[in-house]
């Protein structure tokens, strides 16, 4: 019997095997791919797709990887089959014009039989039906009987990147779980018996636009071995979920739910498997920089988190539970993927926030559904009428409240209702049409023209690292997105030059300003953007005529450039100081380098304290005063990382990178412009520290001349305040504090007066109370009473009435409605809750609200509808109390 290797051992054994055969071991690429055509890394070969398509030269002739992958196209099957996942690891070996079929087949067979110890008699292989070479290699070189080599069609065993381009046949190795059935009944479609574990793709052909296949000049190998699948086989467990890669996560979730996995019913086991699978996907997605949102990969992440929470709820877990689950996932993954522990705080913060928000969504959605059930029941003519939630209502729950359709169906079924799925889909299609119409209004002419021009223009040569002025030739002109031969004075224009000293906006640094000049010509440049390899200068012709083909002198505004350089270098120093003083694991999450300020976003789950900010500011100014000289070098990416250069997380870098090094202080990968010496910055001042998103903080600061401008503006404000308060600058804090105390006392006194007035008015309302059964109901309007005074009056009136219900409304100011409901214990025992009741009444005034079962407040913005809303409240209360 083969050895029961751990998942980690399988991964390392695979990589070591191919490393010993001349393959370069590369780390997993990010789940956020470079390929703009896909949202997520869905296959082991995706990071190498540009090489396979001939768009990039390989750094190594053969490589091997363990690649993180996420696919959600079969998300509904997760947990229901033995091997469907959203997150999985694909082990692969790749050849770029080096070895081909013979070696790939021989090594794959050696690995699975001799290294992993799978019995040859339990393995079956498949080949493309026309690939005689692969068939012969398996039969003659490897020695597999012909009847255990299955010929398959193009749909199963032929790979292509698209309708045209590189393609080729595949060959797969399958494991046989039921060899006792014999070789007479080999059907690779029977996934209860056969499990595909290794896929070999032989890229040897190129398909042209007419569908003709021609041999490739360079033949490539692309393989994939599913780690979870091989772990299932080697560990002798019935499915991928019970391997050591996932099962500890499942056990953690089961423990929280108070379940024993082996004794759980099938539906409970499915929910536990979903949680185990999704936890891994969520962890790696957030670690790779994806944050929950309503678009693109952010929506994929949000959906996965919500499915985790929903399945936890199906297991009876009513409270937040995902943090201990994700901690188990981190423990399992951190040895192979250290970044999951490094980004633990971000992962847990985002997950906890999303979980808590969705639990509120679930609670709100369930309340709304119960109201819908009541409304449908009351509108049914007789018992034969269908108990169905309309597609429009189900879509509103989904679109407005984020309530999943499948959860609407599930709860509806529990209450004997169905959901109009066809109507839901019609509403969804209406939304798609609205989205398409919105997208069609976007003007894409400029980008389209640039894309067309790029086919005829060479890349712009950038001279700005060493030159502030340079001669260039106008290669293209665009006006309102259209290519033109010339532009006259007064017109706005986009200019493409063959060479330029102007820096184009990139890496957070804004583009240069300056001029283009020539014989009788002056063009003011206000911005520079990079479109592919072209630098596009945005400006206006102030004098003369600018023509395509004209030679011009390009001159940047040196004062603006120096300000940008000071702020860019200061940003590097700021990041270095943050890492030293606050947390070495801090990573950049975004930046702005402008002429008048800098903004730096970074990963941190808490605010930076005032003491830390002062230390950071002092350290940066110390480095400035120490006059550290910049060292700029171009080097291989691997060498830069080995030297400790800081890279922006999620940024895509080429094989060669530019490194900005202030030795002993800061070393970063950066394509921006910088000072030659930190002393050129002059001074650095932090002006704000704020939060911009969960787990993301922001520091705004100024450097160089901008510090003086900031201080002058602050002094002006202080002088104005001193004059207004008739106090010296140093006396302002004390004077403001005294005024705040006086204002607070006056407001408190005024509120007390208002409350007393409301109580006096309320006394006169007692006579309006009506008896309903053994209870009393009082619904009334109380003038312009404030919300706080209205609440006091409601509590007072209920106390006077004894058992009953009080609903009061007022118009505290123009355009606003205040409502309050106070219910006694006897009313609550009948099933009426003040919070939900007053929330529904508030909707009639264009608002909402809620609160506790005994006391709740709400508001609206349509005072003209207050009387009507109070009448509805009166009628509903009386009807509800009579019927119960």
UniProtKB/Swiss-Prot annotation:
Gene3D superfamilies (UniProt xref):
2.40.30.130, 3.10.310.40, 3.30.54.20, 6.10.250.550, Bira Bifunctional Protein, Domain 2, Threonyl-trna Synthetase, Chain A, domain 2
Q: Would I find Protein biosynthesis among this entry's keywords?
A: yes
- Binding residue positions for Zn(2+): 568, 572, 670, 674
Predominant cellular place of this UniProt entry's protein: cytoplasm
Any one GO biological process: alanyl-tRNA aminoacylation
Q: Does the keyword Metal-binding apply?
A: yes
Sorted alphabetically, the keyword list is: Aminoacyl-tRNA synthetase, ATP-binding, Cytoplasm, Ligase, Metal-binding, Nucleotide-binding, Protein biosynthesis, RNA-binding, tRNA-binding, Zinc
Reaction(s) this enzyme catalyzes, per UniProt: tRNA(Ala) + L-alanine + ATP = L-alanyl-tRNA(Ala) + AMP + diphosphate
Return the CDD domains for the record.
AlaRS_core
Any single GO molecular-function term of the entry would be: alanine-tRNA ligase activity
Q: Tell me the disulfide pairings in this chain.
A: none
The free-text note explaining how the cofactor binds reads: Binds 1 zinc ion per subunit.
**Superkingdom of the source species:** Bacteria
Q: Which InterPro entries match?
A: aa-tRNA-synth_II/BPL/LPL, Ala-tRNA-lgiase_IIc, Ala-tRNA-ligase_IIc_anticod-bd, Ala-tRNA-synth_IIc_core, Ala-tRNA-synth_IIc_N, Ala-tRNA_ligase, Ala_tRNA_ligase_euk/bac, DHHA1_dom
Q: What class of enzyme is it?
A: ligase
Quote the subcellular location field of this record: Cytoplasm
Give the enzyme's EC designation. 6.1.1.7
Q: What GO terms fall under cellular component here?
A: cytosol
Q: Which cofactors are required for activity?
A: Zn(2+)
User: To which protein family does this belong?
Assistant: Belongs to the class-II aminoacyl-tRNA synthetase family.
The domain-related comment in the record is:
Consists of three domains; the N-terminal catalytic domain, the editing domain and the C-terminal C-Ala domain. The editing domain removes incorrectly charged amino acids, while the C-Ala domain, along with tRNA(Ala), serves as a bridge to cooperatively bring together the editing and aminoacylation centers thus stimulating deacylation of misacylated tRNAs.
Q: What does this protein do?
A: Catalyzes the attachment of alanine to tRNA(Ala) in a two-step reaction: alanine is first activated by ATP to form Ala-AMP and then transferred to the acceptor end of tRNA(Ala). Also edits incorrectly charged Ser-tRNA(Ala) and Gly-tRNA(Ala) via its editing domain.
Identification of the protein by name: Alanine--tRNA ligase
Please report the organism this UniProt entry assigns to the protein. Synechococcus sp. (strain JA-2-3B'a(2-13))
